[in-house]
Design a protein with these regions (language model features):
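Structural motif
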Residues: 4, 29-30, 68
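C-terminal structural segments of small proteins and small subunits
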Residues: 51-86
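Short amphipathic alpha-helix segments
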Residues: 11-28
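Helix N-cap motif at beta-to-alpha junctions
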Residues: 10-13, 48-55
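Amphipathic, hydrophobic secondary-structure cores in small proteins
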Residues: 28-49
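Solvent-exposed beta-strand motifs enriched in subsets of small alpha/beta binding domains
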Residues: 2-8, 43-48
Length: 86
């Protein structure tokens, strides 16, 4: 199963989103530093979660500014990220 990365503007926003996802049943939700190949604005934080959480995130992110949502695919030794924000 693929995972998603939700890029947010601060560690506080990332922590709040991860807690919301865990309360909603996604026990995989956790805060990570945004991978360097995705971080467009220097140091940022993301929430890594299960792919099933994408609709919950898009509909329940009140008060949390989301920069982008990516799906992570692992091909061999490499990780590829696809923007699914829209």
């Amino acid at each position: 199963m693929a995972e998603i990365l939700v890029e947010v503007g601060s560690i506080t926003s990332a922590t709040r989103l991860a807690k919301r996802l865990k309360r909603a049943g996604d026990q995989k939700a956790r805060v990570i530093s945004t991978p360097s190949e995705l971080g467009k604005s220097g140091c940022s934080y993301s929430v890594k979660a299960s792919e099933e959480s994408v609709n919950f995130i898009k509909n329940n992110h009140q008060g949390i500014s989301i920069k982008a949502i990516y799906i992570e695919k692992i091909k061999g030794e490499e990780r590829e990220y696809y923007d699914i924000s829209r």
